[in-house]
């Protein structure tokens, strides 16, 4: 039951609708450029200031933003490289499924260190995808995606 709940949360309630808005509609309607990506990342990140992720004060609310910021950068890079919003949906859903694994490992996701490290790891993911695409080691949908 927990796994089905997490799949529902990961893909149907968050991954699909959020990516449809942020990397689908907003990013694409602004032209799919770097600037569009930056706007999508900033808007997605700032929305999470009101998230309930265990933050207890304003400093923790700011630190919490590291995770959605890093994730949003990775989602934009994946969407831009692949040319598909579905890739971002997969990354988003995978992120939530990874949370289930962390929960099973009894890892404290509600700690500021976890938020900052998680955000940093997402930035590493974005960098790796970007490098692989740039050096044509990853299939890209368009030549423009190579110029990330």
Describe each region flagged by the PLM:
Residues 1:
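A glycine-rich, hydrophobic loop/mini-helix early in the fold
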């Amino acid at each position: 039951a927990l796994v089905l709940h997490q799949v529902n949360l990961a893909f149907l309630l968050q991954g699909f609708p959020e990516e449809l808005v942020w990397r689908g509609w907003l990013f694409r309607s602004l032209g799919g450029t770097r600037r569009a990506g930056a706007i999508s990342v900033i808007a997605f990140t700032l929305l999470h200031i009101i998230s309930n992720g265990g933050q207890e004060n304003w400093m923790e609310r700011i630190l919490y933003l590291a995770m959605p910021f890093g994730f949003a950068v990775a989602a934009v890079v994946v969407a831009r490289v692949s040319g598909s919003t579905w890739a971002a949906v997969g990354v988003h859903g995978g992120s939530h499924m990874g949370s289930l694994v962390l929960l099973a490992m009894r890892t404290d996701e509600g700690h500021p260190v976890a938020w900052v490290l998680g955000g940093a790891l997402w930035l590493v993911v974005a960098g790796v995808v970007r490098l692989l695409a740039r050096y044509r080691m990853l299939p890209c949908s368009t030549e423009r995606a190579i110029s990330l």
